[in-house]
Amino acid sequence: MLEKKDIAAGASGIACGVIRNNYFQPAMRELMAHSVSVWESDPKAFKYNAVGYLQISPEVMHEDVATIYEQQKAIGYESEFIEGEKDCTNYMKGMFDDWQAQGITSILHEKKGGYAFNKDSIKALESKSTSNGVQIMKGVKVNGFKRGSNSKAVTGIETDKGTIECEQVIIGAGPWARDFWN
């Protein structure tokens, strides 16, 4: 694995740390259901706090949130969907007796999920990876790709430390992944 600076030095080290399965795209939801199970596998190492996740919404979001709930149910992801302003208020007052928000007409309560401390959890992933044979090279900047002579297949990664020959490349750069192919 190549790391431009250090583990958790970028967005993963400062992101909000929320672990949830509240996504509108079905494929993302299945991936996140698996991801939540990874967090649950070692909460101590990941500094993971399984407190659940609430999406509290006004009427304008009701239909979309209902769709998310149905898709969660279809993959066996435990959640509860509360509808109607009165029922939503009662549900929230059951958790927070001083609840006062108005205009809430739906609540999606994911029973799984929660939050983790960012850098600690990413460092735990680093430790688990290296203990399973992953080599992490830090301080390596990717400059481009070496391509096969008769194809566009990637045969190496060009870095500021030289070229690394390879058979496969996996880009794990989050929303910046597209930049590697441009």
Where on the chain are the PLM-derived regions?
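Short glycine-/acidic-enriched loop or helix-start segments at secondary-structure transitions
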Residues: A11, V65-A66, R147, F180-N182
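Glycine-rich nucleotide phosphate-binding loop and flanking beta-alpha elements
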Residues: A8, H62, W176-R178
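Short hydrophobic segments within beta-strands
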Residues: L2, I56-S57, G172
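Dinucleotide-binding Rossmann-like beta1-alpha1 core, especially the glycine-rich loop
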Residues: C16-D98, I104
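Helical element adjacent to the flavin cofactor pocket in flavoenzyme catalytic cores
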Residues: L108-Q168, G172-D179
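Short loop/edge segments at beta-strand edges and connector loops
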Residues: E3, E83-G84, K138-V140
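Glycine-rich FAD pyrophosphate-binding loop
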Residues: M1-S12
